[in-house]
Regions:
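Extracellular or lumenal secretory-pathway regions
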Residues: 1-72, 78-127
Length: 127
């Protein structure tokens, strides 16, 4: 099971982009598979993903049980706190000072002014 936590991203185990060692960690899978037997009944259970598009790890939380063609499924979603600014979520201090709902990824995109958000600026600040 520990093998599922091993990560390789261009042969490195951490990133050089973010402000803290925690922010530079590579945690989780690419999102196409996860460890079996996830405890979906705990609110604190987090499913960690690493996204090469945003150059960081993030997590999803269990949302609900459902089914597709009578096959049981579970839905997970990225919670709002993942993209809150560091004033509202101090855990995000590593990822800069952009407004809530967006992530400035220019540090890992050769300085190009690129900001990432959830679809349709979900959870973004009003301004």
């Amino acid at each position: 099971m520990e093998r599922l936590k091993d990560n390789i991203y261009y042969c490195v185990s951490s990133l050089p982009y973010w402000r803290t060692p925690w922010g530079n960690q590579i945690n989780g899978t690419d999102g196409s598979w996860f460890p079996p037997l996830i405890n979906k009944d705990l609110q604190s259970e987090r499913l960690y993903l690493f996204s090469t598009d945003i150059c960081r790890s993030l997590y999803a939380k269990f949302e609900r049980h459902s089914s597709v063609l009578n096959i049981p499924t579970e839905s997970f979603s990225i919670p709002a706190e993942v993209f809150l600014n560091s004033t509202l979520n101090p855990d995000n201090i590593a990822f800069g000072t952009a407004d809530s709902g967006v992530l400035d990824v220019s540090v890992c995109r050769q300085g190009a002014p690129i900001y990432i958000s959830l679809p349709h600026l979900l959870y973004a600040a009003d301004q």
